[in-house]
Structures are given as structure tokens and as C-alpha cells.
A protein has these predicted regions:
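Active-site-proximal cofactor/substrate-binding loop regions of enzyme domains
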Residues: 4-8, 14, 29-32, 37-47, ...
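A short, Lys/Arg-enriched amphipathic alpha-helix followed by its capping loop at the start of a domain
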Residues: 18-24
Length: 290
């Protein structure tokens, strides 16, 4: 099948590679423009563009190029922008969405599932419509979330999504048949810096979920303090103070305490929370965070 692929970040790459490996003719790859990345600020391609060039595929940054390739089907995986309705008239499109629709339509479905304490998530292969993630579903696959980080979950979902997409594309029955989404929709709003700010008014369980997203931080005094790995403990104490359990420091919250397994103080490398605590010379009851 002649396929146009639209995608940008790393989780989209397994689907692109799977389509090629399964013998489909990827006639064009449309991805977002090169961006400045890293400390040097040099322009670098998106992960999808890098993979497409490695595979010898035709790459474009312009959706209008879809008019010129005579594709039979479009496949969209985290493209990073809305697809205009006019483009959906050029070629029918399938979208690989990393949630169990209609739950978590939108930009950050994996992270919102973790933050909400969902027990499971999954992948839906859906027909792309003009409205946001509303199309009928051709195939759904489920996985448990457990204590996985967002990075671990995305890695797993990207592989699952690639297999599911190829199953749909390879089956005339699955391609022709799709079920309307059933249930109350929820929306996965974009994350911002405040999403990752650990506050002592939250429960330890909720803070542990935030840590699993990566980028979690708080403040000790006026210094920014990153929390890389942590887990929730049962504890009663004054929120905003510290406690120590088995040599590991923990942030006392409104409900329980957050044990600091791996941290990165401002201006330092990452280290075990216990090692940081030994060198910090803080008093648990008088030191404050948040």
C-alpha cells in the first residue's frame, strides 16, 4: 500500500519502521521542521526525520506535498499539529493514539493517565477526523500502567501501536470496520512547568506520580531541587518538613511522605537521596521544602 506518514517525536519512529519492514511503500514522510536542540542550540532533525533519511524515504515539512504523492492512506503518529480538514479529503488517514479513547483525547494522554492514577491505558487505531481525536476506532490494545514512568510507558505503547497499526493496514476487514467511541470523553491538556512543581499541599501518592513523569522539582529555601526517583510512604507530620526513614530523606506532605530515592540539587549531579542528605546537614523538623 502507498502510505503517507505524518509524525515527529521518537514514539512515532517504531510505526514508521514497521510500515517499511512490512513491505508498504511509504511515499512521503511529513514531519515538523528542524529545531534547535541541546546546549549548543544547533538545528537538528526530528527523530522521525532522522529515521526517514536513514531509510531513504522522501521527507517534507509541508502538508501540501501530500497533493503530489498519490497516497492510498495516511498514517499519523504524534505529528504535532492539527491536520486541516482539506487534507483529510486528499487521503483517508489513520491515527495511532496512545490512550483508550474516548478517555484522554488530546496532547498528553500518557502523562494524564499516570497523574489520574489510571490502572491501565493502551493504543487506539482510529480514523482521523477534523475534530480532536473523535474518530471511530478500528483496533484497541490495552496494557497495565503499574508504577511505570511516562518514558517507560511511551516506549511500550510505541511498540504496541506500531504492531496494531500494521495489523489494521494489513487487514481489509479491520480497515473497513470501525466502532464509534463509547463513553464520556476526557481531555489530556498539555503539561506546563507547574505540572512538575512538587507542592506540600498534595498527597505523597500524587507527588510520586508527578515524579514518574520526569522533570519533577521543588524548592529547598530558594534553591531549585530536582527529584528524579521517589516513592510514597505512610507518615504523619507537618507538611513542608522532612523526615528520614532508613537513612533516606522524605518530604512530608499533606498525606504521607515522599521518599527521595534519587535527586539532583541545583548545580550538582544526580545522586542517591541518602547521599545528598548526609552532605546537606539539615534538621528534619526545621528544614522546609516547597
Amino acid at each position: 500500500m502507498r502510505i503517507a506518514f505524518l509524525g515527529t517525536p521518537a514514539p512515532a519512529v517504531p510505526t514508521l519502521r514497521a510500515l517499511v519492514a512490512n513491505g508498504h511503500e511509504v511515499v512521503i514522510v511529513v514531519t515538523r521542521p528542524d529545531k534547535k536542540r541541546g546546549r549548543g542550540g544547533e538545528l537538528s532533525p526530528s527523530p522521525v526525520k532522522a529515521a526517514a533519511l536513514e531509510l531513504g524515504l522522501n521527507v517534507s515539512h509541508t502538508l501540501k506535498d501530500l497533493y503530489n504523492v498519490d497516497a492510498e492512506l495516511g498514517v499519523v503518529v504524534a505529528y504535532g499539529a492539527m491536520i486541516p480538514a482539506a487534507m483529510l479529503e486528499v487521503v483517508p488517514m489513520l491515527n495511532v493514539h496512545f490512550s483508550l479513547l474516548p478517555r484522554w483525547r488530546g496532547a498528553a494522554p500518557v502523562e494524564r493517565a499516570i497523574l489520574s492514577g489510571d490502572k491501565e491505558t493502551g493504543v487506539c487505531i482510529m480514523t482521523l477526523e477534523e475534530a480532536l481525536d473523535t474518530g471511530p476506532v478500528h483496533l484497541e490494545q490495552r496494557i497495565s500502567i503499574g508504577e511505570k514512568t511516562s518514558s517507560e510507558l511511551l516506549d511500550e505503547l510505541s511498540i504496541l501501536g506500531a504492531k496494531a497499526l500494521c495489523e489494521v493496514v494489513g487487514s481489509e476487514e479491520l480497515l473497513k470496520n470501525a466502532d464509534p467511541q463509547v463513553g464520556e470523553p476526557t481531555y489530556a491538556e498539555k503539561l506546563n512547568s507547574e505540572t512538575f512543581n512538587l507542592k506540600n499541599t498534595e498527597s505523597a501518592t500524587q507527588l510520586a506520580r508527578i515524579v514518574r513523569l520526569g522533570r519533577a522539582f521543588t524548592f529547598i529555601g530558594e534553591r531549585r531541587f530536582k527529584v528524579l526517583e521517589a516513592h510514597a510512604l505512610e507518615h504523619q507530620g507537618e507538611p513542608g518538613t522532612f523526615t528520614v526513614v532508613g537513612g533516606t530523606p522524605a518530604l512530608v506532605t499533606s498525606e504521607g511522605a515522599l521518599a527521595l530515592d534519587v535527586v539532583q540539587p541545583e548545580g550538582s549531579k544526580s545522586m542517591a537521596g541518602s547521599a545528598w542528605w548526609l552532605g546537606a546537614h539539615l534538621e528534619p523538623s526545621s528544614a522546609h521544602w516547597g
